[in-house]
Amino acid sequence: MINDIKKDAQERMTKSLEALGRNLAAIRTGRAHPSILDTVKVTAWGSEMPLNQVAAITVEDARTLKIVAHDKNLSAAIEKAILTSDLGLNPSSAGTTIRVPMPALTEETRKGYTKQASGVAEDAKVAVRNVRRDALADLKKLTKDKEISEDEERRAADEIQKLTDKFVAEVDAAFKAKEKDLMAV
């Protein structure tokens, strides 16, 4: 029972950390990276589709993404989707190939993105702490139902706290790495 609670808590905390990684990857740095366009949806064949399903996205150089549409008729729709996204990117089209240069980040935008990354990291910490709260509540219920002793509850609670501390430290490390990446000129 206790092991199930700890295992569930660890799995949920791991999922929170993975979500943090995806969310931080979506925050633009000065470098070109295909994950920047993960949020872009293209109207294709009568429905909204993620850009990576209708085109191949590659890194051409440090500051340019190259997009090749699977269907040449979608080039205009892809270009429009990138322009209308709130990423501040300005694609240029040449036949079926679309190039997306990454504009250099100003100090102000760097600080804004750092603040956004900080918020994402804080949300991840809250998620990890909510998992801890749920696990501790489950332990209390087991103690109340006399399925485990108070000593076992305390030991398990300490282990869950250590797990929480470990994941919060990983969240902090991920944020610090992203902050360093954002502030590098």
From Swiss-Prot:
Subcellular localization: Cytoplasm
GO cellular component, one term: cytosol
Primary location class: cytoplasm
The keyword Transmembrane belongs to this UniProt entry's keyword annotation: no
Keyword tags: Cytoplasm, Protein biosynthesis
Gene Ontology biological-process entries: cytoplasmic translational termination
MF annotations from Gene Ontology: ribosomal large subunit binding
One Pfam family matching this protein: RRF
Keyword flag Protein biosynthesis: yes
Family indicated by similarity: Belongs to the RRF family.
Function in brief: Responsible for the release of ribosomes from messenger RNA at the termination of protein biosynthesis. May increase the efficiency of translation by recycling ribosomes from one round of translation to another.
Name of the molecule in the record: Ribosome-recycling factor
Lineage start: Bacteria, Pseudomonadati, Pseudomonadota, Gammaproteobacteria, Pseudomonadales
